[in-house]
Design a protein with these regions (language model features):
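Hydrophobic faces of well-ordered beta-strands that scaffold small-molecule active sites
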Residues: 4-14, 31-50, 75-83, 103-107, ...
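N-terminal active-site wall of soluble small-molecule enzyme domains
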Residues: 46-100, 111-116
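Short, acidic/polar
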Residues: 19-25, 86-97, 141-155
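Short linear motifs at secondary-structure transitions and domain/linker junctions
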Residues: 17, 52-59, 81, 104-107, ...
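Conserved anion-binding
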Residues: 100-180
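SEC14/CRAL-TRIO lipid-binding/transfer domains and related phosphoinositide-recognition modules
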Residues: 3, 7-28, 46-62, 66, ...
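N-terminal cationic-hydrophobic initiation segments that often serve targeting/anchoring roles
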Residues: 23-26, 30, 68-72, 96-97, ...
């Protein structure tokens, strides 16, 4: 892990209205000293291919570059793509690398191939990589423990800038805070 600026994340940016609300928040309630606001734009393999989704938190992929550019115009926000797929990660990463205004990438993927992530980082050293620590980090019994989380994170040493413990995998369910 690198010594990057920590962040407080807000995800689900879809519209100009969302950006305005985030900017209002950033102006009226700046993050604690030493932190920054992360502005997350959700992208899936389906939306990346131009498909629609019923989840209102995913913008059309055609709108993503403009959202990221507008977020990047404000120094108080850090534009991050949260990406999920089940297969074809290397090809998807090549496409995502073309998002010039993206400054962070969180892969909501179980066991992303370290070599594919490292190749992405070589192509886009300006993009900070967030490793989602999800169910793939569980130990043999299926439990997330501090040791199993540490082992999972260690596999991405040198490529992950941050690790986000997300045992709910984006579903918002409670986790054991003693583990987190």
């Amino acid at each position: 892990m690198s010594a990057r600026t920590p962040y407080i994340g807000i995800t689900g940016i879809v519209t100009a209205g969302d950006i305005h609300a985030l900017r209002t928040l950033a102006w009226k309630a700046p993050p604690p000293f030493g932190y920054r606001w992360m502005a997350g734009v959700l992208v899936s393999a389906k939306t990346l291919a131009g498909g629609a989704t019923t989840n209102a938190r995913y913008p059309r992929f055609a709108d993503v570059p403009a959202l990221l550019e507008e977020l990047g115009d404000d120094t108080r926000t850090w534009p991050v793509v949260h990406f999920n797929c089940r297969e074809g990660l290397a090809g998807h990463l090549r496409t995502l690398a073309g998002l010039e205004a993206m400054r962070g990438l969180q892969l909501n993927v179980q066991n992303p191939d370290r070599g594919e992530v490292a190749a992405f980082k070589r192509d886009r050293p300006d993009v900070e990589f967030i490793l989602q620590v999800n169910a793939a980090a569980a130990d043999e019994s299926g439990a997330l423990t501090p040791d199993s989380i540490r082992r999972y994170i260690d596999r991405y040493d040198g490529v992950a800038d941050f690790a986000l413990v997300d045992a709910s995998a984006g579903r918002g369910t409670a986790i054991d805070l003693a583990v987190a």
